[in-house]
């Protein structure tokens, strides 16, 4: 279970991430959480992980919030159903990022459907879910410090560079093999003439 000291941290993390995502979509103007660069390394890490998640799973995850047909009367039930389904196989950091992205998408859909009061409620549900359903797992997995170590301080960019570097090496080898094969074929052709 979460300690009382973690509650403001969780609330601030949720508010920062949701505000950041709403601003990305052009829904929020003015000062508030999520505006500008995040000073807190945890907030920076969650923003980067959320952006990476959306980039990788845009097709799969896009329009999920719209497909739920959320109304003020059904929003909490839908939120809980999707969250429970998301963690059905057990929590991990990737699913936790998906949870944040889903919550922010639900907030954006609420603004889009002119149900702005739901934004604050969804954030409260996110905080409550984190503190009641996921706090023990987060704590036993190294806490938010472990998340920040895994996803913060450019770790995602470095992993992407390594992945792209590995694929670039594979592409180079394959291209070289194809070119060598073509040269051998051309050489054999001219040798037979």
UniProtKB/Swiss-Prot annotation:
Keyword Acetylation: yes
Motif (BH2): 136-151
Membrane-protein topology: Peripheral membrane protein
GO cellular component: Bcl-2 family protein complex; cytosol; mitochondrial outer membrane; mitochondrion
Residue numbers covered by motif BH1: 85-104
Tissue: Expressed (at protein level) in a wide range of tissues with highest levels in brain, spinal cord, testis, pancreas, heart, spleen and mammary glands. Moderate levels found in thymus, ovary and small intestine. Not detected in salivary gland, muscle or liver. Also expressed in cell lines of myeloid, fibroblast and epithelial origin. Not detected in most lymphoid cell lines.
Subunit structure: Interacts with HIF3A (via C-terminus domain). Interacts with BOP.
Record remark: domains: The BH4 motif seems to be involved in the anti-apoptotic function. The BH1 and BH2 motifs form a hydrophobic groove which acts as a docking site for the BH3 domain of some pro-apoptotic proteins. The C-terminal residues of BCL2L2 fold into the BH3-binding cleft and modulate pro-survival activity by regulating ligand access. When BH3 domain-containing proteins bind, they displace the C-terminus, allowing its insertion into the membrane and neutralizing the pro-survival activity of BCL2L2.
The protein's name in its UniProt record: Bcl-2-like protein 2
Organism, scientific name: Homo sapiens
Highest classification ranks of the organism: Eukaryota, Metazoa, Chordata, Craniata, Vertebrata
Gene: BCL2L2
């Amino acid at each position: 279970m979460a300690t009382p000291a973690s509650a403001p941290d969780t609330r601030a993390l949720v508010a920062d991430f949701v505000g950041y995502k709403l601003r990305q979509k052009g829904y929020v103007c003015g000062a508030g959480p999520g505006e500008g660069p995040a000073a807190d390394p945890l907030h920076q890490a969650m923003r980067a992980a959320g952006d990476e998640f959306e980039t990788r799973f845009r097709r799969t995850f896009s329009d999920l919030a719209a497909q739920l047909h959320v109304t003020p009367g059904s929003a909490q039930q839908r939120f809980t159903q999707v969250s429970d389904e998301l963690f059905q196989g057990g929590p991990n950091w990737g699913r936790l990022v998906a949870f944040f992205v889903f919550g922010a998408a639900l907030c954006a859909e609420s603004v889009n459907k002119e149900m702005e009061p739901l934004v604050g409620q969804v954030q409260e549900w996110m905080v409550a879910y984190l503190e009641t359903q996921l706090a023990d797992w987060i704590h036993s997995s190294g806490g938010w410090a472990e998340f920040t170590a895994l996803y913060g301080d450019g770790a995602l960019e470095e992993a992407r560079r390594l992945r792209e570097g590995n694929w670039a090496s594979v592409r180079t080898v394959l291209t070289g093999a194809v070119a060598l094969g073509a040269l051998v074929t051309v050489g054999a052709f001219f040798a037979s003439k």
